[in-house]
């Protein structure tokens, strides 16, 4: 005699089993992050057990944010890790997975954090184009505009160079990661600079609005309005490229990576930059000290009193002696 239990067991068909699986099957949707175990490696991908009825598949191009030539560079049999569900089930009921998407999301999260901390990062230039240079930060492709590359060598020679960089723009939605080499250099250089400091620089470029002065590997702007007290039609009438001049720092803007310079404040008399540049260079330190004293007086809210020169003191003494002689 066959028991009822045995009859029930015999009557449990494959269709019943499939229906039971459907009843308790988890629903997977694109965008979900799930745990999965590698159970089969293929030449261009791998099969992953994530608890679905059919093994999910991850193609080699979705295994990393970086280039992968062999799946075993990233995955090993029986390894368990997180996967991103990339697509719905295909006609065979198979899901497509991705590790690259997870790395991509976390990379953007990391660069946003680095930008918020105003961190300086380093990266090798892997290519250049007409607009600038290309680097990778946390696996993401970043762009350095030509105007933010501060280097004395040709742009195309930067390939392979390890550069310090600051973040200019981090926009995941638009897939824009823009960085500045110049700002990183200026920030580092600024640690040894201060307003009212006199430095020697070389004219590296001349524009209608001013001259760019190289001061130890970084550029500062000598605006046309800060060249002289006298009117100047164009900086070209005052400077030539590669001229060596003394300039005074009048502003340091670390956030924008800008150094503002002046020769106007170093003029012992108006127009000296146009008439006698050697005199400006000779008296640069003295005029810079006067500039510092003026700024200090302004900060304290008191009027500035220029120091009495030695010649003026001698004249006063001569006048005093002359008066004494007359009295006698």
From Swiss-Prot:
Biological function: Binds mRNA.
This protein's name: Small ribosomal subunit protein bS1A
UniProt organism field: Synechocystis sp. (strain ATCC 27184 / PCC 6803 / Kazusa)
Start and end residues of each S1 motif domain: 31-100, 118-182, 196-264
GO BP, one annotated term: translation
Gene: rps1A
Biased composition (Acidic residues): 311-328
Keywords: Repeat, Ribonucleoprotein, Ribosomal protein, RNA-binding
A cellular component annotation (GO) from this entry: ribosome
């Amino acid at each position: 005699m066959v028991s009822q239990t045995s009859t029930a067991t015999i009557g449990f068909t494959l269709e019943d089993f499939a229906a039971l699986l459907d009843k308790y099957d988890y629903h997977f949707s694109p965008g979900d992050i799930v745990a999965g175990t590698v159970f089969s490696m293929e030449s261009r991908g791998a099969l992953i057990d994530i608890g679905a009825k059919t093994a999910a598949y991850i193609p080699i191009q979705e295994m990393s944010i970086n280039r992968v030539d062999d799946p075993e560079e990233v995955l090993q049999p029986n390894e368990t890790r997180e996967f991103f569900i990339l697509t719905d089930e295909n006609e065979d009921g198979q899901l497509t997975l991705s590790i690259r998407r997870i790395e991509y999301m976390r990379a953007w999260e990391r660069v946003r954090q680095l930008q918020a901390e105003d961190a300086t990062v380093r990266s090798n230039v892997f290519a250049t184009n007409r607009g600038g240079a290309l680097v990778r930060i946390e696996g993401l492709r970043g762009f350095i505009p030509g105007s933010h590359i501060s280097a004395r060598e040709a742009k195309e020679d930067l390939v392979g160079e390890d550069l310090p960089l600051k973040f200019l723009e981090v926009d995941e939605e638009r897939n824009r990661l823009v960085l500045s080499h110049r700002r990183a250099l200026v920030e580092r250089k600024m640690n040894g600079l201060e307003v009212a400091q006199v430095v020697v620089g070389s004219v590296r470029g001349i524009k209608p609005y001013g001259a760019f002065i190289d001061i130890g590997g970084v550029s500062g702007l000598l605006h046309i309005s800060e060249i002289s007290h006298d009117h100047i039609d164009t900086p070209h009438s005052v400077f030539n490229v590669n001229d060596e001049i003394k300039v005074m720092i009048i502003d340091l803007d670390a956030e924008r990576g800008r150094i503002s310079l002046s020769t106007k404040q170093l003029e012992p008399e108006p127009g000296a930059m146009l008439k006698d540049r050697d005199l400006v260079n000779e008296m640069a330190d003295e005029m810079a000290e006067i500039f510092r004293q003026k700024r200090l007086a302004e900060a304290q809210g008191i009027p500035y009193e220029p120091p009495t020169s030695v010649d003026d003191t001698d004249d006063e003494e001569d006048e005093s002696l002359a008066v004494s002689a007359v009295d006698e």
